[in-house]
Amino acid sequence: MHRRLFIGAVLLLSGCSTIGITDLFQDYATQLRPVRQAVSQNNIASAQQLLPSNSRGHSNYLLNQLETARLEFLAKQNSQANETFEAVYQNMEKIRQAAKVQLSAGLEQTNSLLTNDSVIGYEPAAYEMTMLHSYKALSYVFDKQLESALVEVRRANKVQEDALKDNQAVLDEQAEKAAEGYPDMAELIGNVKNGFQNAFTFYLSGLLYEADKQFDDAYIDYKKALEINSENSYLQQTVL
């Protein structure tokens, strides 16, 4: 399964060798250029040393911790990586809950639910949360903990399902355009979904379900991955 996992990852993420949750934030991404260069040279130890150290009160603290966990994963420090990822996940859940309270109560701040004021208003994107769980699942795979890996892909898929619901209006709008004569509806819908869902994560969960002999669930997630990345020949061969 490891071989299929790596082949699929390369094909699905070609051109994205430095895929990281922090890529969505240009200012922080700029700071990470030396880190990425070290990673591209397969010098993970150097990358870990070059990673900026942000205090808990820094606005980029959680992003920094995500990158810390990713580098621990690349360094095959799986146990430590999972601890760091889990800590970030728990902090993100607090922030998401605080955001809901702010929205429903119209509050400017909810200090009791946040670890520090500087992160008020920051709600992690679905793509960030999805990749967090994907990295954790991969760490468990390499430690031969299939059940724990399945827990993480279920978490990831829950994030993706919620993102789909949140963006249903956009999908409906694009479907209407497709009905008016757009040449390739599958490609259009896939492009829209790619903005908030992740084909690789669906592919990963498909692999893990297949390894657990949950073949129907595996096929469903392979199809979801293909819907997002309809031109990927590897996914086409997997589904057909």
What are these regions, as identified by a protein language model?
Residues 29, 33, 67, 71-74, ...:
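"A position-specific structural signal for the A-helix of alpha-solenoid helical repeats
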Residues 33-72:
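Post-signal-peptide N-terminal segment of Sec-exported extracytoplasmic proteins
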Residues 60-63, 91-104, 160-172, 226-240:
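Boundary/linker segments of alpha-helical solenoid repeat arrays
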Residues 16-37:
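Bacterial Sec signal peptide processing site at the extreme N-terminus
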Residues 25-26, 59, 126-127, 189, ...:
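Residue signature of alpha-solenoid helical repeat architecture, marking inter-repeat boundaries
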Residues 51-52, 85-86, 92, 153, ...:
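Inward-facing hydrophobic residues that define packing positions of alpha-helical scaffold repeats
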